Amino acid sequence: MPNIKSAKRRVKISERNRLINKAYKTRMKNSIKKVLLALSEGKTKEEVEQLYKIAQSAIDKAAKIGAVHKNEAARRKSRLMSKINKHFAIE
């Protein structure tokens, strides 16, 4: 438990930031799951690409505010796109 006034304020700020980061990460992970679910359900390429654009936006927003590192965001987008390309190359 912090005793100094500034430390007490920092506890409030860090809790607020934790919740904001958690929301961005959850949005990012859910959008990635939607893309992977669409692939497993056999949706068309156009539908999957539309979902990928939404996921890409969510990943970029999470990286922009610092919820995830920019390299992690790039890696997630790259891996997701390679899964999409691999799936549609088989067909």
From Swiss-Prot:
Keywords: Ribonucleoprotein, Ribosomal protein, RNA-binding, rRNA-binding. The keyword Repeat does not apply. One of its GO terms (biological process) is translation. GO terms for cellular component: cytosol; small ribosomal subunit. Disulfide bonds: none annotated. It comes from the Bacteria. Belongs to the bacterial ribosomal protein bS20 family. This is Small ribosomal subunit protein bS20. It comes from Thermosipho melanesiensis (strain DSM 12029 / CIP 104789 / BI429). The lineage of its organism: Bacteria, Thermotogati, Thermotogota, Thermotogae, Thermotogales.
